[in-house]
Amino acid sequence: MPAAVIGGIATHYEVTGDGPPLLMFSPGGFSATLSNWTSLGIYARLRLVDHLARSYTCIMFDRRESGGSGGRVERITWPDYAAQGKGLLDHLGIPRAHLMGGCVGCSAVAVFAASWPDAAASMVLYSPAGGARYRITQQSRFAQHLSYYSERGGAAVVDLAQTSGQVFTKDPRLGPWASVIRADPAFADRYRHQDPAGYQTIVAGMARLLFDRDTVPGPEPEDLLRLQIPALIVPGQDASHATSAARYLEECLPRAQYWDVPVSGQTERTAPARVLEFLASAESQ
């Protein structure tokens, strides 16, 4: 798998298919890997990549601190996640692309479009993460990690990450840098010996700013209201992907199309066809 260094952090990515570029921000929360597009939940069932790659050049990547990508201990923000995707386009020499996000990737897509509107041909926002229960769950996850770190220290987190094979979403004690600890011995050593008070301040701020609302986190509504970029919104319907989050995006995006179909009606026959129909219409505008 090829890798690009973006903002000093290695990004593992994959390009498949042929046609106009489609930059895909992976689903999967704090384990947002490119493989999730073909192996995780609804995305595996719909086989979206198989269908999209027939008409588009699909550019997928492991989000920073996920999978084979690297990371850095800092107060990570949604603009940081969006900048990783923009940096990948720059690395590939692509000035403009369609954007697609699944789950948590929708937040990064919306921030990307608000930050670099000229680089965004359209947005597909599939099952956006958000909602009150989503916020509560995420903040609780960070609180559990901080409690474990405070009691046991960085060395215990490193030892746990290197022996458990789990990720932050499955075991909150690990924190959001577990995959980097596991893959990079030098990073693990720095993590083990970092300043505890400074680290806890970083993590507390990260949790507060990433998950600060009971809808789609990331983009500010005032920025979305000004975006003149075609968008297709496909709703989710569970504790992490509240339908209200999708409706919020519909309310805020002036050129939004809302595919009002329940998750049970989103099938391999219907969903890829709807996404392809939207992308084709955006191409013609």
Q: Regions from the language model: what does each represent?
A:
Residues 101-109:
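Gly/Ala-rich beta-loop-alpha elbow adjacent to hydrolase catalytic centers
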Residues 178-219:
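Hydrophobic, aromatic-rich cap/lid helix
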Residues 254-285:
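Catalytic active-site module of serine/aspartate enzymes centered on a nucleophile-bearing elbow/loop
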Residues 6-70:
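Conserved HGGG/HGGXW glycine-rich cap/lid loop of the alpha/beta-hydrolase fold
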Residues 114-115, 119-152:
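Flexible "cap/lid" loop of the alpha/beta hydrolase fold
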Residues 226-227, 233-235:
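Short beta-strand/loop motif that positions the catalytic acidic residue
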Residues 79-97:
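Conserved acidic catalytic loop of the alpha/beta-hydrolase fold
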Residues 239-245:
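Conserved alpha/beta-hydrolase "acid-adjacent" motif
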